[in-house]
Amino acid sequence: VPPGVRIAEPIHCLAAIDDGGVDTSHVLVVLGEDAEATVLTETATCGTTGSGTGFHCGGTEIVVGKNALLRMVNVQNWDRGVWHVARQKAVIHENAKLQWTLAALGSRLSQVAQDVALVGKNAEAQVNGVMFTEGKQQLVYNTLQHHEAPSCRSDLLYKGALQDRSRLVW
């Protein structure tokens, strides 16, 4: 998003696979100085009834420029047989704000590494997530918030509801 531009409508990105498919999508979101946007990324398995298989190895990179605001929403809704590996990184500059919300609903196994680097003075990050699992699903999350500049603020809140023999590893 160019400097000074405010996008009123959300930008929607969908990564979908058929049964047995592979996805290696890479999402790059860059907001220039004083820009504002909302981005929704979604993953899904198509043409199945919840038991499709596949493999996803994807990345998300976010750069929030000086005085910019990004509202980022990730919805992971793979079928129960998909293996999901993701690397997510955000860099937040001076007086910029990131509101990042994640929902983990599907997959057989999810391995997610999420880093937020607050590199500018007064940079701010609010990271929220929710997980709902069942059966033998296993979700593994590793989150880091790096306060690299003075007067930065980050807030991290994840909640999970697990059923059956599913597991969540932090």
Predicted regions and their residues:
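Conserved beta-strand/loop scaffold segments within soluble protein domains that form the structured core
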Residues: V1-W170
